[in-house]
Amino acid sequence: MNFSNYIKINFLKIISRHKVRPLILSSSPKFLILMNQKIGDMIVCSPILREIKSAYPHADIHVMASEVNKELALSNPYVDKVHVYKNQWQKLLPILSGLRKLNFDVAVELEYKVISRIIILLKIVNPNCILSVSKSEGRYGMSPQEIMPYDYYTNSSLFHQRDTCLDILRLLNIDYKNKFYDVFYPEKNKLDALSFLSLFESSKIIIGLNIEGSNDEKKISNEDVKKIILGLHAINNNIIIILLHKPGDKDWISKLIPNEASLYAFPSYPTESILDLAAIIDSLDLIISPDTSIVHMACAFNKPLVAIYRNHMLLFEIWHPISDFNYVIFSDHEDSLKSIDIDNIVNQTFKLMKRI
């Protein structure tokens, strides 16, 4: 063990020392829910916001969101106040100082692995009680069981992050009514999506094809994208394929569309925000995606879905799609989407088309 890790391990042990405090709630408790992760993380954990507000209508629910998912939090009617997490301590500390003054009854920590910075953050905010999901990964070679700085944890035998998050409600003595994800967006975003889709024949099945996730390892190769487009049309020519893309990517996305597909495959309109993306996904008939954020968003709207995952079964157990109709296609590799079965993607998509 190098000296740097030795210092980190001992520091983590020191800040993890903790006496369990009682959970005491009034009829109008004040909650801080940490959701400063990715878009998909917030969607998967979204049911707890609804269920807490249902059980405690006068609760004051504050959410700490990230820059990438803050719009989802701001549009959620169960959230009373949103605080945006900052990566730099000099920007984060004034926010934490303000949160400390609010004297939260309960903070809820939803990371699936141990993160030292979050432990320090909650030490500074100092809520009366901290509830946390059980951790799948430890830190610096220590197991999650060696690092337990919070008051109460969810059942460690649960695997999927949705179920682990919902177990927070058990700690609060709340019987939840349903497990569905929530994604909210304004009517304007819906009208923009419908206006774009009105350009196409209403009799067509409109498929949303997303080709990349949050990093290059979650990207479908250009050649495979072309094969998927041509393969889908070969098996059913009553379709329109919309290539979902990030703002500014329209030009290179357009170049992926084969010339022979120019009458049925098109780039999407610019989705400048998460709410634009949510609106178009909600308006499409079927989704194909390797991006777990889009996968979980499609699940929130219960859209027929073909999800493409790396062959990493631990992460799949935690983050697999949950909806009425979905198929999962695995890459042959744990760390990339190289060597995915295009025929299987096309065939599973065709099966879902028959349900529409």
Predicted feature residues:
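Catalytic machinery of carbohydrate-active enzymes
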Residues: 1-356
